Amino acid sequence: MSSFLVAYDDESEEEDNNNNNNNNNNNNNNNIINNNNNNNNSNNQIKDEDNIYSYNNDTIISQSQVQPKTVTLGLNNKLNQKKIQQTQQIQEKDKLSSDFNFYNNNNNSNSNSNNDENDDFIYNSNNKKRNNIDNDAEEINEFRNPDLKNKPKSSHSLFSMLPTPKSSQNTTTTQQSSYSFPKPVNNNNNNNNNNNNNNNNNNNNNNNNNNNNNNNNNNSNNNDDEKDDDKSKKINENENTVNKKDNIENQNENQNEIENENENNNNEDTKKKINNSMIPGSLRKKLLKNQPKTKKSTTTTTTATTTTTTITSVKPITTEINNNNSNSNNLPSIPIGNEKSKINDNQDEEDENENDGLFFSFQQSSTNNKKPQQEEIDYSAYINNDDGDDDDDDDENENENDSQPEEEYEENKQQQQQEWTQEQIQQYWYMQQQEQQQQQQQQPFNLKSQQQYQHYHEYNNVGKIYEVNQSKMLEENNSFKILELRKTTQEQDRVLANIPKVSKSQRQKHTIGSLLGDYQTKKYKFE
C-alpha cells in the first residue's frame, strides 16, 4: 500500500473563510432592504384596501368611514329625544321660576307697579306651563305605542310587540349627508410599483432561505431554554400561592381556637355562679339548659405527635419470640391518638355532671382564691317562659325535695317502695280506723254536715251488694242538695209558727205587694 501525504496551506483556508463571511453579511444587508421595501408595499396595499369604493345611489362612500347601521323600531330614537326634551323643559321651568320670584320681589319693593303688566306676565307663564304638560302627555303616549305616526295600513302593527335588540342600545342611526366623501385615486401607479417590488423579492428569496436554516437551529435551542424557565417559574408561583393559603388557614384556625376557649371559659364561669347561687331547683335547671354548650377544640395536630412518641418506645424483637412456633411478629400494643381524645371527652362529661349536683354550695372552690363577683341576672325571661315545656315542670314538681337531682330521687323512691310490706300496710290502716272511731265517739252525728253523712252512708254499706239504678245514683249524688231543701223547709215552718195570725185577705195583699216589688226591682235592673 502506497501512502500519499498532502500539505494544506493555512493562509488559503483563512482567505476562503473571510470571503464566505463577507458574502453572508452582504446577503443579510440585502434582506433587510428587501424587507423594508415589502413593508412599504404592504402599507400601500392597506391604504388601497381602505379606499375601495362602493357605488350606491350615485354616491361614493369609503368603507373605513361607514358606521354599522342597525334597524330600530322607533323606541331608541324616541327615548333619546325624550331625554333631551326633559332637560330642556327643566331648564325652561328653572327660568320661569327665577323670573317669577324676581317679579314677586319687585312687587314687594315697588308698590307703584302696573297691574296690567302683572296680569299679562302671569297669563303667559301659565300658558307655557300648560303647553309643557300637553307635550309630556304626547310623549308618554308615543313611548307606550311608538308606531302611531308610522302605522301601516293593516289593522294593527306587530312591530310594537317585538323586543328591542340588545346591540341597538349603544348604536344610533346614521345619515349619509353627515359623511365627508373623498375623491377617487388612480390605481395604475400602484400596480406598477407592486410589479417592480415583486421582481426584487424573487431575486432575494434564495439568499433568505440559506440564512433561515442557520437561524432555525439557533432558535430551537433558545426555545427549549425558555420553556424550561417558564416551567420553573410556574412551579414556583404555584408553590407560593399554596404556602400563602396554608398560612391564612392556619391563622384562621388559631383565631377560632382562641375564641372557642374564651367562650368556654365564660360559660363555665356562669355555670359556677348559677350553681353557687340560692336559686330554686326548677329555675336553676332551666338556666343551665338554656346556656350554650362547650365547643370541642380541634386536636388534629396533637394526635399526630402522640403517635410519634409512642412508636419510639417500641422494644426490638428478642430471640425468645423467634424460638416459639409463632410466625407473626408479636409487637406491643400501640395506643391510638383517638383513644386519648375519647378519655378526655368522658372526663369533661363527668365534670359537668358533678357540677349539676352542686345545690346551695356556699363553699368557695380551692382553685379560685378570689371571691366570686356577684352579677345581676335577669330571671324574668325564665319565670314567664311559656315555651310549652309543661311536661318537664310537672316532673320537677313531683319531686318533694327540689334540691336533690333526679337520679338520687329515683333511687330513694325505689328504696321506699321496697321497704313497705303487707304487715306494715295492715298496721297503717288499723291505726287510721281507730282514729276515725275516736272522732265519731267524741262528735255527735249530724245529718246536716256533709262529711258525717257520707261517712255514715259508707260505714253502714261496707259489705253490702245491691243493684245500682239511675235513681239511686242521682240520690247519692244529690244528697247534699236534698239536705239543703230540708233546711229551708224547716226554717220556713219555724217562721210561720212564730208569725201572728193574719186574715186571708191581708195575706193575699201582702203576697201581691211582694210580687209587685220583686217585679219592679227586676225591671230596673234590666233597664
Swiss-Prot record:
Residues 8-17, 386-410 have a biased composition (Acidic residues). It comes from the Eukaryota. It comes from Dictyostelium discoideum (Social amoeba). InterPro entries: PRCC. Residues 1-49, 99-307, 319-353, 382-419 are annotated as: Disordered. Residues 141-150, 229-248 have a biased composition (Basic and acidic residues). Residues 283-296 have a biased composition (Basic residues). Residues 18-44, 99-115, 167-178, 186-222, 297-307, 319-330 have a biased composition (Low complexity). This is Putative uncharacterized protein DDB_G0289963. One of its GO terms (cellular component) is nucleus.
